[in-house]
Amino acid sequence: MNTVKIRDIEIGAGVPKIIVPIVGVTKEDIIEEAKTFDSIPIDVVEWRVDWFEGVFDFAKVEDVLKDLREVLGNIPLLMTFRTSKEGGEKAIEPEAYAELNIKAAQTGYVDLVDVEIFTGDDIVKKIIDGAHAAGVKVIASNHDFFKTPAKADIIYRLRKMQDMNADIPKIAVMPQNKKDVLTLLAATEEMTTNYADRPIITMSMAGTGVISRLCGEVFGSSMTFGAAKKASAPGQMGVNDLNTVLGLLHDAM
């Protein structure tokens, strides 16, 4: 499998890399939180731009990106507009979604953008091509906050992301029971063993699925989300605890 190198971080090798989300509403909140990150173990910062009050004014978005880049130094920055249909804070028209992501990629301040794979193939391709042209990597994503699809369906979605040339396919699903967590882990193992030629990210959400956020190095998920202040999805552990567990598992493997 090929790894993905972003600044000093190599995704897909060794310990799963920790992504910490920022979900502030105001510019002040966002930058203040970012300033606390030098004291905690973070590999990538995700700015959940759908939470930002000025998200539909690109000049304001770029202003925050510029300051984030300055505060974060060499920490890679992922910008994500999570749409309301996939659990995010706001709705957005597909063309506006494409424009936001491509313009952000072109600023030079972001290292990755997140693209929801079922936005429509034309829009998805436009964003992936636009980001790549700007030297920015793409996480293609899919979220099911209600259920866990069948193993074959999870693998199909991840393979679709890979086929559309996303750098890192990502899926997050909600377990209704413990067996659903096993389904997600089995899909992860099968995808990485049989199909993936690049890193993937998978997780089973909520408390029931928390084990999936810890065992990525065993089954093949290359990144995991930890909360510094406010979790952006159910089941996220605090980043310090997450880092400790990932390290203990890595050392024992």
For the regions a protein language model found, what residue spans apply to each?
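Catalytic alpha/beta core domains of metabolic enzymes, predominantly
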Residues: 112, 117-253
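Active-site beta->alpha loop and helix N-cap motifs at the rims of alpha/beta catalytic domains
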Residues: 2-4, 14-133, 143-147
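Glycine-/acidic-rich phosphate or pyrophosphate-binding loops and their flanking alpha/beta elements
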Residues: 7
